[in-house]
Regions:
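Alpha-helical membrane insertion/targeting regions
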Residues: 1-223
Length: 223
């Protein structure tokens, strides 16, 4: 009994960690959505969202389920037991990821820079937002060609970039505790570090296995 349960429990270590990593950004996003829905005092930090709420609302409504559903795709035993759910969730995950990436780029290009942002962070947002979008497009192309291993690799890359906000909480926290509020240059480094760390971990996961499991099952047309 214990030997059978051990691998099953270990299957949930990574998904649990990823969900935990999503909690702070998800809570912050929920607070933002509540402010926009109910109204809040307009400040320099939020006035751009009230002036043009559509991109941030679409982004938050898609990036939160993207992070949560994506985490469950890393539980092999769960995928095997719930293949139909896995297939359907994969479609939702793909749609959410595309909208999240597109709206991230939209916000970067359309919103005025908040205090603390600068050219370096602006370029980082464009680069990693574009990389996430490209990864998702490549994942779609791979699944249409029934290249399941390639599909899995591209989805891992897209998910890693999409989870950048969670890792950025961890890169910022020590700086806040030891130094204080970061200036423009420090903020760019800390934000960039979150994306780079995630991208590095994604490549490590991919290279660790020569045949990574596809995160999303093929569509009915290709199954």
């Amino acid at each position: 009994m214990a030997s059978r349960m051990g691998p099953r429990r270990s299957d949930w270590a990574l998904p649990t960690g990823l969900i935990a990593l999503s909690v702070v950004p998800a809570l912050a996003g929920t607070v933002r959505l509540t402010e926009l829905a109910r109204g809040a005092v307009i400040t320099a930090a939020n006035e751009r969202f009230f002036a043009m709420p559509l991109p941030v609302v679409l982004h938050l409504l898609t990036v939160i389920p993207f992070s949560m559903l994506g985490a469950l795709q890393f539980a092999p035993s769960f995928r095997e037991r719930h293949r139909m759910w896995h297939r359907r969730a994969g479609r939702v995950l793909m749609a959410c990821g595309l909208i999240a990436a597109l709206t991230a780029l939209w916000m970067t290009l359309a919103y005025p820079w908040p205090v603390g942002d600068g050219e370096a962070l602006y370029l980082e947002r464009l680069v990693f937002g574009s990389a996430m979008l490209l990864s998702l497009v490549m994942a779609i192309d791979a699944i249409r060609r029934r290249k399941f291993a390639a599909h899995g690799r591209w989805m891992i890359r897209a998910y890693a970039i999409g989870m950048g906000a969670g890792t950025q909480v961890l890169t910022h926290l020590p700086y806040y505790l030891l130094v204080g509020r970061p200036d423009e240059s420090s903020r760019a480094v800390l934000m960039g570090a979150g994306w780079v760390i995630n991208a590095g971990v994604a490549e490590w996961i991919i290279r660790r296995s020569s045949t990574p499991r596809a995160m999303v099952f093929p569509t009915p047309a290709s199954s």
